[in-house]
Every structure is written in C-alpha cells, then in structure tokens.
UniProtKB/Swiss-Prot annotation:
Component of the PAM complex, a complex required for the translocation of transit peptide-containing proteins from the inner membrane into the mitochondrial matrix in an ATP-dependent manner. It is found in: Mitochondrion inner membrane. It comes from Cryptococcus neoformans var. neoformans serotype D (strain B-3501A) (Filobasidiella neoformans). This is Presequence translocated-associated motor subunit PAM17, mitochondrial. Residues 33-45 have a biased composition (Low complexity).
Length: 217
C-alpha cells in the first residue's frame, strides 16, 4: 500500500521541482522590469574619465564677466600708452648720453643709427609690457575676483576660452581672402556680441565647406 502511494506522489513531486526554476525566472523578470529597482551590477566595467568642463555653478554671471573682461582689456590698452612713452624717454635719454664716435663702427654700422634703433627697441618693449602692467593693476584693484585658488576670474577665463575653442571655425579651411573672423574672440564684450560671433562662425563654416571636395574633409 505504501509503495503504491509513493508511486502516485512521485509525478507530483517531479512536477513541483520542474516548476521551481520557472517561478524563479518569473520572479527575476518581474523584479528587473520594476521602475523602482536598482541594478546590483554596473552596466559597464570599463569607465573612461570625463574630460568635459565642470558642470557646477560658475562664480560669475556671463554679463558681469564680459563687462569685467572689457574693463581689463581697456586697462591693458590704456597702460600701453604711458609704458610706450616711458620706454622711448628712458631709451632715448640713455643712448643720447653716450658718446658716439663716427670712426668706430658697431657691427659695421655707424653708432648714431645703432643708438636710434635701440631707442625704438626700448619704445617697442614698453608697448609690449603695457598689457601686462594693465592686467596687474586691474587684479590689484579687483582682489575679490582676481585672488583665490582658483580665482573666479581665472575660472571664467577658462570656461570662456573653452567655449571659443568649441564653437569657432576650423582654421584649416581659411585662406588669404577668407580668414576666420575673430579667431580668439577678442571682440566679444557682451552677450549680443557673442551671439553675433556665433553667427559669423556659422557663416564662415558654410562658406568654407562650400566647394571643398569630399575627400579633403
């Protein structure tokens, strides 16, 4: 009697064991399709470092930064005038005090011409160091934005030039008759000029791409 009962119950036990994996698969499918579930394993094992700019809030707004950038450029331009004349006066005064003997040539050239060229060189040197002096004076008069690690103005400069490099036209397509307009964005002083700069870059890209063979692109 017990043997016959065991033989009748064996198919039922076998059926339960075969349904168990199917139930587990249904449970796994329902849990994975749930919108609130979180995967236990990462989808990718090889993650590459991101080279994009930081997405955090910028220390300055763009209108205020462009206004400060315009002021700094103005300071650099204005200080070039006194430094140029200072180099001219210092160089001219020094070389004028030297005794020039026409019979003694300097590299085969009369001393008067050499001293005159050196005076012009001092004037050019004063013109070149003018923007650096102006930028230094601007930083001293605006310590809240020019100091720090990193300084707010430095962060904005980095972000600004990143956008310039990203949106400007490819210089490989330029020619003597068709030069990239404002390649470094030096004329950008406001949001309106920045939008105009973007339009100019787009127009240049269309002109540069027009008529270029496909194999050269």
């Amino acid at each position: 009697m017990s043997r016959s009962v065991f033989s009748t119950l064996r198919p039922v036990i076998g059926q339960k064991t075969t349904l168990a994996p199917f139930a587990l698969s249904l449970r796994h499918a329902s849990s994975s399709s749930s919108p609130f579930s979180t995967p236990t394993e990462p989808t990718s094992f090889h993650t590459q470092p991101s080279h994009s700019t930081p997405t955090g809030p910028l220390p300055l707004t763009w209108p205020s930064y462009l206004s400060l950038r315009r002021q700094r450029r103005l300071w650099s331009t204005l200080t070039s005038v006194p430094t140029t004349f200072l180099g001219l006066f210092l160089g001219g005064g020094y070389f004028a005090s030297l005794e020039a003997d026409p019979s003694q040539l300097i590299f085969g050239v009369e001393p008067m011409f050499v001293y005159g060229g050196a005076t012009l060189g001092c004037m050019a040197l004063g013109y070149l160091i003018g923007p650096s002096v102006g930028a230094t004076l601007f930083s001293l008069t605006h310590p809240s934005i020019a100091r720090g690690n990193p300084a707010p103005l430095e962060v904005m400069d980095r972000e600004f030039y990143h956008r310039i490099r990203k949106n400007r036209a490819d210089p490989r397509f330029q020619s003597v008759q068709n030069i990239v307009p404002d390649f470094y964005g030096e004329k950008i002083v406001s949001l309106s000029t920045y939008r105009r700069w973007l339009r100019d870059q787009a127009v240049y890209k269309r002109k540069a791409m027009h008529g270029v063979p496909g194999e050269d692109l």
